[in-house]
Amino acid sequence: MGTRLTPVNGQPFHCSDTFKMQATSAESNVGAVSSYLGLPVKVLTAFVKGSPVSRFIKDNLASRHMTFEGPEFDAGGPWGLRHQINLADSGAGSRGPRVANDRAGEVGRMLAADQFDLDRIFGEEGAQFIHLSGLIAALSPETSQFCLEVARKAKAHGTCIGFDLNHRASLWEGREEELRQVFHEIATLSDVLVGNEEDFQLCLGIDGPPPGGEGIAGKIDGFKEMIGRVKQAYPSTSVFATTLREVVSVNLHQWGAIVSAGDDWHVMEPREIGVLDRIGGGDGFVGGLLYGILREWPMEKAAQFGWASGALAATLLTDYGQPADEDQVWSIWEGNARVKR
């Protein structure tokens, strides 16, 4: 877990003097859809003993209806451990968002499997699903091993595993071969595998369409071919998903998704969504998809809920969706933005 500092009113970071701070992580952002809709969610993470930022993060997770578990490390002095900071503005109009990560001394790099009683979590507590992000898997050699061991233990207990590849070039630099092996094994163990066109190419070596660009709706066949290759490479995985995004302007995107399960394909054709802050939209999609899977909905319904949950997250300043209820999410899918009284 870390924090995000965001300038108010859509201003650039470098010329702002007023900021909002929020607690954030890819995994907790995904879990927020389920926690706000009443499912129990626990976050496994690390804290800094006595840190007011750790207290801020714990209080935020509690406000999201989540529990948490993890070791508390001594800071080790003023140059020691702390929580990472994302310096991220929202962009506005024709000026795109910019993100800089300050990860010096990040306590999350210290995570190890033996800091948790995984048999209790997956056995006695009966966790049905564990979601892993490639951000943590690539953070350090220790966290790579942590994610591997968590996935292996979950598989041994019959717990479903979700893995969002979340490639970040800065974390992979100099560790490409090592991380490719780690990500391959986690993907092999996973029941749900998520990534965009760049993630699948850079993390797993599977060819796909060129990243980004215009005309995303006309590239759907290329995305399906890419997912087809991923399915061949990972035959034990049950669900494969990718999002489709074309940026018209900072505040207007074409947003779509593709989900494949078994022989079935569920394509949410890109359509316009309004965007207040784009960061967390992909996590919102995954969170909505997993909520539908946990509710044992038909896959088409779960995929639609994922699309709408991602669109919801894009309307919020937080990195995560905070649905009031299922009806609010479905109204987004249906394109109904009328006032509800």
Please provide the spans of the model-predicted regions.
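Short pre-catalytic strand/loop immediately N-terminal to key active-site residues, enriched for Gly-Thr
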Residues: 14-24, 228, 266-280
